[in-house]
Curated annotation (Swiss-Prot):
Cofactor: how bound: Binds 1 zinc ion.
Cofactor section: Zn(2+)
Active site: E79
Organism name: Actinobacillus succinogenes (strain ATCC 55618 / DSM 22257 / CCUG 43843 / 130Z)
Keywords assigned by UniProt, alphabetized: Cytoplasm, Metal-binding, Zinc
Protein known as: Protein SprT
Length: 170
């Protein structure tokens, strides 16, 4: 199937999934929710982004085309859950207990915070950094922040400071 036609079909699947998840949410909470606007402008490694105050969701077209089934079934409810939580509770932790409850109790899905898609095609240039336990690949933006001394990044596992792999030690 031609890519443009395939993309059109996937957009329809996303709209159907959004509508189904909205309907589940409205039945579960016994109230209506505003239908979000949807676009496909996200770039980089993010699969989707929810804009809470705009009631909008932006999806990554490339990751959608490369992972259609998982994208429709996991990413769409994930981003919609952020909007549902915002409409119910206002500003709370992005993947906090309210969001987790919507994912598990309303959508009957695991409350996974990150996708597992192969991001090689969308990743862009990376820079190798090391901590006490492993090598990390940082984006150009994070690398530049470190170089300009505007940010320090710590490993999520060992809490060690990330240092450039090619840094010359005194």
């Amino acid at each position: 199937m031609e890519q443009q036609t395939r993309f059109r079909h996937l957009k329809m699947q996303i709209q159907r999934k959004l509508n189904a998840c909205l309907q589940k949410s409205e039945q579960f909470f016994d109230r209506t929710f505003a239908v979000p606007t949807v676009s496909y402008e996200v770039r980089g490694i993010k699969a989707g982004v929810a804009y809470l105050q705009k009631n909008a969701i932006k999806f990554n077209r490339t990751l959608l085309l490369e992972n259609p089934s998982e994208f429709v079934n996991q990413v769409v409810p994930h981003e919609l859950a952020h909007l549902i939580v915002y409409q119910l509770f206002g500003r709370v932790k992005p993947h906090g207990k309210e969001w987790q409850a919507v994912m598990t109790n309303v959508f009957q899905l695991p409350a996974e915070t990150y996708h597992q898609f192969d991001v090689k095609s969308v990743q862009g240039k990376t820079f190798a950094y090391r901590c006490g336990c492993r090598i990390h690949q940082l984006s150009v933006r994070r690398h530049n922040k470190i170089q300009r001394e505007r940010a320090v990044y710590l490993c999520q596992y060992c809490k060690g400071r990330l240092e450039p792999v090619n840094k010359i030690c005194p």
